[in-house]
Amino acid sequence: MNKVALYCRPGFEKECAAEITDKAGQIGVYGFSRVKEGSGYVIFECYQEGDADKIARDVDFRGLIFARQLFVCGELLKNLPPEDRITPIIDQLKGSTEKAGELRVEVADTNESKELLKFCRKFTVPLRNQLRKEKILLKVENYSRPVIHVFFIAPGCCYVGYSYSFNNSPFYMGIPRLKFPADAPSRSTLKLEEAFHVFIPYEEWEERLASGMSAVDLGACPGGWTYQLVKRSMMVHAVDNGPMAPSLMETGQVRHHQADGFKFEPTSKNITWLVCDMVEKPAKVAALMTTWIVNEWCREAIFNLKLPMKKRYEEVAHILDKIRAELAEKGINAKIQAKHLYHDREEITVHIQNIWAAYRPDREF
């Protein structure tokens, strides 16, 4: 198996391909991408045998912006016989992986592929049973073992392979399944909820998304992102010239500042979270977020950067490099992650954690 399959949002295949080519080159792996626009996936074929596995191990999946999932795969299996689709899949997996902990039979995130989902669910059960008989899959799911992926791109056609649990997306199809809360002011609330799932390990939620923390939401109106903070019992400074949802104001957890998000400065030093979803040039938003981190006005920030029409990966990489350079120049040790989330469209979501910023327990509000 000398290929890597990557899932992405349909329409962003070129960005996904540019990114994996760049990241693979950084670890000395070279190859070429097969891209079909609108397909929702990319196949990166390595020149050297064994390099696909190296990518799966050594290219930090959490560091990829446009990929929703990454796994090693072999040649496309075509025209699987309806009377026995399982044997060719088993044959391709033999010798590639053993004692895997999980099976995922998946499709791309397109309207055409979603018609295959019903089949995938039915096919999973007999395939899982046979994989266990062949000892390719453990009898009991084990989330610390490799994951087997069977990725159908059309009826009877699939890529088969594996990913490592320490370097993949834990979500089926790489998409967190979130339900829109009926009382949320806008659907944008799902962006921030997804960002929490993607950027913050669940075991750290109790500490890093704790009740009673203070937060600032820049460009808050009508309150989609503020809703997520309030739901976690945080006290929120909502900054926007527009109106906030009355339901949020009635909680007593929100203070509305009718001001420009680019000019607002906090008066207290107890802000843990800064969130920002403003429609503005990405470089301007990035500069604002950098200022907040440098001044230690917050400990962690999640914000959106609107994507340009052309060279989207290159522009985003440039902006993120600039943030890293400015923070390093100021002696700030920060962890930066960025992802084109499922609930993002023409933007990406960025997370910055100031590792050395001490949380101050005083809670002025």
From Swiss-Prot:
Keyword Methyltransferase carried by entry: yes
One GO BP annotation of this record: methylation
Residues the entry annotates as binding S-adenosyl-L-methionine: 188, 221-224, 240, 260, 277
InterPro entries per UniProt: RlmM_FDX, RlmM_THUMP-like, RNA_MeTrfase_FtsJ_dom, rRNA_MeTrfase_M, SAM-dependent_MTases_sf
Enzyme Commission identifier(s): 2.1.1.186
Domain of life the protein comes from: Bacteria
GO molecular function, one term: S-adenosylmethionine-dependent methyltransferase activity
Catalytic activity: cytidine(2498) in 23S rRNA + S-adenosyl-L-methionine = 2'-O-methylcytidine(2498) in 23S rRNA + S-adenosyl-L-homocysteine + H(+)
GO cellular component: cytoplasm
Protein's cellular compartments: Cytoplasm
Pfam families: FtsJ (PF01728), RlmM_FDX (PF18125), RLMM_N (PF21239)
Active site per the UniProt annotation: 306
Keywords: Cytoplasm, Methyltransferase, rRNA processing, S-adenosyl-L-methionine, Transferase
Job description of the protein: Catalyzes the 2'-O-methylation at nucleotide C2498 in 23S rRNA.
Oligomeric form and interacting partners: Monomer.
Family the entry assigns: Belongs to the class I-like SAM-binding methyltransferase superfamily. RNA methyltransferase RlmE family. RlmM subfamily.
This protein's name: Ribosomal RNA large subunit methyltransferase M
Native species: Proteus mirabilis (strain HI4320)
